[in-house]
């Protein structure tokens, strides 16, 4: 536990010093960094909207998995986990969620 806290303190210090190298942020680390950068006012997760039309993505001839893949290819903004947990992201990308 102490090691994790030390690591987070060092990470926050590096970000405060202007280090803009991409890092991977997941779980608690992501929440702490958002809280620090956004002054405790980052966007909270909303309940997903689902309807019978959006569930099928309007493409009834496609399998649901393939329809979701195609829907994502239209330039829809990814969630913060996709941007910062699955791949490294910068402080500027994190600030986009404030």
Curated annotation (Swiss-Prot):
Cleaved signal peptide residues: 1-18
InterPro entries, sorted: Bombyxin (IPR017097), Insulin-like (IPR016179), Insulin-like_sf (IPR036438), Insulin_CS (IPR022353), Insulin_family (IPR022352)
Pfam families, per database record: Insulin
An example molecular function term from Gene Ontology annotations: hormone activity
Domain of life: Eukaryota
Signal keyword on record: yes
Annotated SMART domains: IlGF (SM00078)
One GO CC annotation: extracellular space
Disulfide partners: 26-85, 38-98, 84-89
Key words of the record: Cleavage on pair of basic residues, Disulfide bond, Hormone, Secreted, Signal
Subcellular location: Secreted
Propeptide regions on this chain: 47-75
UniProt-listed SUPFAM superfamilies: Insulin-like
Quaternary organization: Heterodimer of a B chain and an A chain linked by two disulfide bonds.
Stated role: Brain peptide responsible for activation of prothoracic glands to produce ecdysone in insects.
Annotated family: Belongs to the insulin family.
Protein name: Bombyxin A-3 homolog
């Amino acid at each position: 536990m102490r090691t994790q806290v030390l690591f987070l303190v060092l990470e926050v210090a590096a970000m405060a010093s202007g280090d803009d190298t991409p890092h991977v942020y997941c779980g608690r680390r992501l929440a702490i960094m958002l809280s620090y950068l956004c002054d405790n006012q980052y966007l909270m997760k909303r309940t997903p909207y689902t309807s019978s039309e959006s569930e099928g993505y309007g493409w009834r001839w496609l399998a649901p998995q393939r329809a979701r893949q195609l829907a994502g290819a239209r330039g829809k903004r990814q969630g913060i986990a996709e941007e910062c947990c699955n791949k490294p992201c910068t402080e500027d990308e994190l600030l986009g969620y404030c």
